[in-house]
Amino acid sequence: MGALTSRQHAGVEEVDIPSNSVYRYPPKSGSYFASHFIMGGEKFDCTHPEGYLFGENSDLNFLGNRPVSFPYAAPPPHEPVKTLRSLINIRKDTLRLVKCAEEVKSHGEEAGKAKVHYNVEFTFDTDARVAITIYYQATEEFQNGIASYIPKDNSLQSETVHYKRGVCQQFCLPSHTVDPSEWAEEELGFDLDREVYPLVVHAVVDEGDEYFGHCHVLLGTFEKHSDGTFCVKPLKQKQVWDGVTYLLQEDYGIENKSNTQDFKVAEDDVRDNSAECVVCLSDVRDTLILPCRHCASCNVHCADTLRYQANNCPICRLPFRALLQIRAMRKKLGPLSPSSFNPIISSQTSDSEEHSSSENIPAGYEVVSLLEALNGPLTSSPAVPPLHVLGDGHLSGMLPSYGSDGHLPPVRTLSPLDHLSDCNSQGLKLNKSLSKSISQNSSVLHEEEDERSCSESDTQLSQRLSAQHPEEGPDVTPESENLTLSSSGAVDQSSCTGTPLSSTISSPEDPASSSLAQSVMSMASSQISTDTVSSMSGSYIAPGTEEEGEAPPSPRAASRAPSEEEETPAESPDSNFAGLPAGEQDAEGNDIMEEEDRSPVQEDGQRTCAFLGMECDNNNDFDVASVKALDNKLCSEVCLPGTWQHDAAIINRHNTQRRRLSPSSLEDPEEDRPCVWDPLAV
């Protein structure tokens, strides 16, 4: 350190006290800093000569002009550095001047020339009893390690006010006023040569000898506005502990921004409320960039990236000279209790603990979040409430029924239809909806379970067969007939085929555990109108034998000839469907097979779907080869609805076995030949 190199061999008592210029920057001679510095028990080389790592070099003049002895012993090499406990904190951003309610008038002074006096107010926090005094135009002196401030006039100080411990206390002394207009202009600011501070707020701990000499000092200056009014601005803050003066510097980026404040933030004021590293956006910030003091990165990988690949701070883009990691530790207290456990802190510190490159954690200590160590536990946002029972007619995760009965459909695991709506005066309206949407957890079941469920479904439906038919005129067609399919995606008219409906695949556990999102998808995108059904092409093929496996379809197909209904559009509103002779159709134009092939009818006389128990060709079918053909194109696998296929085509399909189909309910008892079912007429 130039002329000061002899200080390392001499005691503190031998330093020349009158030479005040020794600890002033810039020094009159020599260098202020040495070639290295010691921090955290380790020695580091100074890459930038005469560079103050924690701020501007001029800030060193606030530390004092007298050398002091360090009162603490050096910590062991493997012990963490102990932090000093600050019992008092004055919030410098709350320091302000408040005009008095009544203007003070001097004797013999005119009313128009009345002077304006101000009160000094600020907010502070204290963990001990404190005595606060305000000084004006004062100088600083240290006697026996205790800081004292002496104003140039005894009238330039307030009375001492005592406060108890508390948080967010307000200092307001109406009996004490100040008039900065009485001072000269140079006295409003701080002059290093004069060493006179315009404003000093001195808060001393008042709790006996244990904390004797511990104080907090806030230095401020005055400014005059163009309209003649004055304001006060904070200059620096200091802590005096055991005779050593510590200059307080602000670190940016580690404040607890989630705390509620008295003022409202404007909508256009964009603020960074996150505590993650600005480089990787995953770990918690714990590395301070010096000298700009931006806590913006983590020490996992980003600190090394800044050291070897970048030279500027990622926030202010100024060049930096050092990186300081601040890792907060505490003694292990055992497992955290539920009351002190914070999910935000745990999630933020887990990655840093696992990926930390230097695990120099002393025995008996654990790492805590820096935000928690400085600001206390973070406020966790309330968790998203789970779905509850909505009411009598609603279940969690399911949609209410839209049928005419107004009740929820019975939850079935075997039948693909929920219920049938009542008949109205205009015609028969069927509303067929699946009992449940296929959830992701139950989209694939074993083959044996599918065949067993379909067999049981066919057995139950065969018991409800009846010869009753709705009495309706041959020309009466229902106005609308919506067929609700359970599909995982939107229905595309060009890709939809008329493959028969399969039995509903439902979750074997809770009948009300289906996904709400898929239920909404099924109800919103699977309502097929009459026009959609009429534009769909399909061939409803009954299964063949019970042998396993699927044979490839025959390349031969019966040619499709136009029927009378297609040639005469006036006879039917829908010309896309071919009909059977009059004796083989019902009043609606649907196919009627003999005895076993008739459409099952429920107890109230309403027809159910004629192809109940068949499977639907949608996105949930994996192993079923669907037959696709447009209405205006001939497909090799499509034949005329309601007609028998040629024997040559039957031979190749004789061994075809569709999964999840029970052939007993759809075969012709007299001939072992599959028939083509007509699409649902509308």
Swiss-Prot record:
Predominantly expressed in the brain. Its main location: cytoplasm. It catalyses: S-ubiquitinyl-[E2 ubiquitin-conjugating enzyme]-L-cysteine + [acceptor protein]-L-lysine = [E2 ubiquitin-conjugating enzyme]-L-cysteine + N(6)-ubiquitinyl-[acceptor protein]-L-lysine. Gene3D superfamilies: Zinc/RING finger domain, C3HC4 (zinc finger). GO terms for cellular component: cell body; cytoplasm. The keyword Zinc applies. Residues 479-538 have a biased composition (Polar residues). A motif (D-box 1) lies at residues 330-333. Keywords: Cytoplasm, Lipoprotein, Metal-binding, Myristate, Phosphoprotein, Transferase, Ubl conjugation pathway, Zinc, Zinc-finger. A zinc finger (RING-type) spans 277-317. The modification Phosphoserine is found at S662, S664, S665. Its EC number is 2.3.2.27. Residues 440-604, 655-682 are annotated as: Disordered. A lipid is attached at G2 (N-myristoyl glycine). GO terms for molecular function: ubiquitin protein ligase activity; zinc ion binding. The D-box motifs play a key role in RNF157 stabilization. This is E3 ubiquitin ligase Rnf157.
